[in-house]
Amino acid sequence: METFKKAMNESAWVRWSVLILVGFILSVNYYFYDAFSTLNDLLKAEFDFTNTDYGLFVSFYSIPNTFLLMAVFGGMILDKFGIRRTGFGFVFFMAFCALLSAYGASSYYGAGGFGHAFMNGFWPSYSPELKMMLLGRFFFGLGAETSIVVVCKILVKWFKGKDLALAFGLKVGFGRLGTFAALRISPALADEGVHLTTAIWFAAVLVLSGLLAFMVYMLLDAKLDKQTGFSQKASSSASEFSFKDFVSIISNRAYIYIALLCVTFYSAVFPFMAYAPDFFADKFGLSAVESGNITSWLPLGTMLFTPLFGFLIDRYGRSATAMIFGALTLVAVHLIFAFTTLTPIIPL
């Protein structure tokens, strides 16, 4: 029987088990983020949300990471305090704030539960339900994005020099699995509004289970550090933040080009995902369940093809060519949606 005389990250089955564990954390993160995209019309009916309200709710996720640079500061905190402490703190924050958003949509809160009177006392143009959900969404985004950075560092720690691009491709696949599940399960649980809060609470409890999964990972991480003689204190000292290093990174032209590519690429994907079920329902007359099912084909394709491209890039390179191909394909898809009446299954 195999023993752990060698470091745990040298064992293939342990590495892939770690990937599955942290991939689950990523999946529930994406599940909660996308669970509301198929509930847009139901939120309007239940809480009198407008399209502007829904857009505000979706956008609040990004505020702490865009305007407060929390993803950047989260990376600094990660370098300073390490995977276990940083990861637990931000995943806990993510789980708590997912529950806070669900609480804002609950009938107990709507009937005057804790915090309702306070939320009703300001910003009168928005409902107390929306304000509580915005609060949860804001802080969920703060925790969720840094937790993604933590997952990336975990994969580097376990897969460096061992199929790292494939591991990152599978990481993306796990995230899209969460999106796929949300688009399929959320409208079914909501049952045309009969059980809207059930769908939201289910998403929040999944995020809570992600916190439990991270606690399990912490045990494996501590054991690996013990085997390799890794010292968090020494690591944090070596990773001490330097403003000079920060300036060096943001003035690096290659980094700037990659960052701009990510911004433009994701701005064409994630806003579309948030509104796609509503778009398909309006343009093609589909129900919430049908439009959610069709939208779910997009993350399904990502789950299948991202690991494949990761494997090919590991073996043959050509990452720039793959990026250009992906960008051109995305342009073609949006043009088809905008100017044709083809069934949405084809471009997706």
Each language-model region and where it sits:
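Extracytoplasmic
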Residues: 17-51, 272-277
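C-terminal ends and interior cores of transmembrane alpha-helices
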Residues: 92-126, 328-342
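Central cavity-lining transmembrane alpha-helices of secondary-active solute carriers
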Residues: 59-76, 296-309
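Flexible cytoplasmic inter-helical loops of multi-pass small-molecule transporters
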Residues: 218-244
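Cytoplasmic membrane-interface "Motif A"-like loop-to-helix N-cap segments
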Residues: 79-91, 314-327
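Helix-loop-helix hairpin linking two adjacent transmembrane segments in secondary transporters
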Residues: 171-225
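Cytoplasmic helix-loop-helix junction between adjacent transmembrane helices
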Residues: 130-132, 136-175
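Extracytoplasmic gate region of multi-pass secondary transporters
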Residues: 36-40, 252-306
